[in-house]
Amino acid sequence: MIKFDERLKELRKEKGVTQREIAEFLGIKTRPYQNYESGDRRPDYEKLVALADYFDVTTDYLLGRD
């Protein structure tokens, strides 16, 4: 089962966007987003849903429950 941080990084690279671009979309600074990709932090529910919408995937997929 793939972990959330790995899935998030994989999706970002597939879409060809930077961490900064996604952070701006979420309305946060780049560092907190980097913490999501490094596994140091998890987004709150609202940000998780926003990420799923951004990448056009389900929250289950993001969380590695595919």
Which positions does each model-derived feature cover?
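A short, Lys/Arg-rich alpha-helix, primarily the initiator
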Residues: 1-14
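Residues in the recognition helix of alpha-helical DNA-binding motifs
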Residues: 11, 25, 36, 65
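Alpha-helical residues within the helix-turn-helix
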Residues: 13, 24, 53
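DNA major-groove recognition helix of helix-turn-helix/homeodomain DNA-binding modules
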Residues: 27, 46-61
